[in-house]
Amino acid sequence: MGIVLLSGCATNITPNNPVQVAKVPSPMTAPAPDHSGSVAKRLNDCIIRGNQSADALLVDSQVIAVTRNNSHAKALFSSADKLKDEQAKALTNYLAEANSCRPIALEGLSPEKKAVYEDFFKKIDGVYADLIARKITIGVANQERQLLMQDTHMKKLALQSK
């Protein structure tokens, strides 16, 4: 997910199911598009593919609120549970698929914007590693992820205003 940050570049494609819905900032706060139309489409397609697996569905409902309007989000953000073995395995598999989209997300970015993305990837990978190692709870992981996404969004807006 790093995924959600990646999906901020998604184009407007009508999803066939809720798992295909990528989180996108509201138009009022959305930064200028990071990618050309063809890169944005390839990135969106990659994200949608990753969000359709059984592991992605389990992660979205039991571990990390990946999709927009997730009916499990409130419970996930307040969960004091640590990962069970099945959840840790699903998250690991989901991340392997989702992280395959990262090279596309970095295509054509300015060095400054690329650095923002890479910093986000490094930090979110740390959150996921702590979650899988059971150092933090599901709730803490969701909260940290949200804070990282907001921080990254603000950094991208700051770059845009330069």
What are these regions (language model features)?
Residues 54-61, 136-140:
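Surface-exposed patches in mature extracellular/periplasmic domains of secreted proteins
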